[in-house]
């Protein structure tokens, strides 16, 4: 830690306080995440250290780079590249009645998918994607932050400040207590973020797990074994759930064209096995008119 100076506290993440800091010799500005662990006495679990070390290998222009992992007084600090704005804050700055430019929505979604495909191809899930951990710069680049931390530290039910961790972007298989889940959980989250990019409003903003499920069911219909094999045997599925009929996504998300709504509907398919993959999503006709040559991941490929 002696290599870094804390400049100021910039926020409170899922796992602890985040500081803006500076490397004493290089002058590079960084984000320093102090990880607060449930069992303070026992120190940092070796599994967490192992998981985190793997994340240092994830180098991609749309992933926030983990530069260093440091220990001080049995506290773990993760040193990340610094970006000053997250997507939630950015959407909040857009004046009422105005929306994100359609080409920006498309570019952001494409870059988010490029980042997720990179991680999924390396068997790393995010599991907790939301606008707060999508960071942006002033050049139109968007990066995914906090990758893999859910696996290393678990997703707490409450942030250590006792604020409830948001359920708005969580997939139905996780909400219904499925023990076996995989890459489709991230695709669902990206689908809900896609809708929010277009409308500035969360698509499903439940205030409890059951409210979250019912908001999804009201929009997409209550799932059953016909549309999602074995859903009725998931731990938290109840036969007493109200049986809502599927509605039209277009009524909830009005700023998307036909291709956009088609892609969104494929990202929000109940059955994880049928949900579109990140790789397939990148090839969807929605992106046909996007100039991909200027995107950061594509610029690197040229060299």
From Swiss-Prot:
The entry's comment on post-translational modification says: Phosphorylation at Tyr-15 by WEE1 and WEE2 inhibits the protein kinase activity and acts negative regulator of entry into mitosis (G2 to M transition). (Microbial infection) Phosphorylated at Tyr-15 by Rous sarcoma virus v-oncogene Src, possibly causing mitotic slippage.
Q: Which key words tag this protein in UniProt?
A: ATP-binding, Cell cycle, Cell division, Cytoplasm, Cytoskeleton, Kinase, Mitosis, Nucleotide-binding, Nucleus, Phosphoprotein, Serine/threonine-protein kinase, Transferase
Main localization of the protein described in the UniProt heading: nucleus
Concerning InterPro entries, the annotation shows: CDK (IPR050108), Kinase-like_dom_sf (IPR011009), Prot_kinase_dom (IPR000719), Protein_kinase_ATP_BS (IPR017441), Ser/Thr_kinase_AS (IPR008271)
Q: List the disulfide bonds.
A: none
Q: What is its EC number?
A: 2.7.11.22, 2.7.11.23
Q: Which residues catalyse the reaction?
A: 128
Instruction: Indicate where the modification Phosphotyrosine is found in the sequence.
Output: 15
Which compartments does it reside in? Nucleus; Cytoplasm, Cytoskeleton, Microtubule organizing center, Centrosome
Protein kinase domain: from which residue to which, for each copy? 4-287
Q: Does the keyword Nucleus apply?
A: yes
* Residues binding ATP: 10-18, 33
- Write down any Gene Ontology CC term: nucleoplasm
The catalytic activity, as recorded, is: L-seryl-[protein] + ATP = O-phospho-L-seryl-[protein] + ADP + H(+); L-threonyl-[protein] + ATP = O-phospho-L-threonyl-[protein] + ADP + H(+); [DNA-directed RNA polymerase] + ATP = phospho-[DNA-directed RNA polymerase] + ADP + H(+)
Q: What does this protein do?
A: Plays a key role in the control of the eukaryotic cell cycle by modulating the centrosome cycle as well as mitotic onset; promotes G2-M transition via association with multiple interphase cyclins. During G2 and early mitosis, CDC25A/B/C-mediated dephosphorylation activates CDK1/cyclin complexes which phosphorylate several substrates that trigger at least centrosome separation, Golgi dynamics, nuclear envelope breakdown and chromosome condensation.
Q: Assembly state and interactors?
A: Forms a stable but non-covalent complex with a regulatory subunit and with a cyclin. Interacts with catalytically active CCNB1 and RALBP1 during mitosis to form an endocytotic complex during interphase.
Protein name listed in UniProt: Cyclin-dependent kinase 1
**Organism per entry:** Gallus gallus
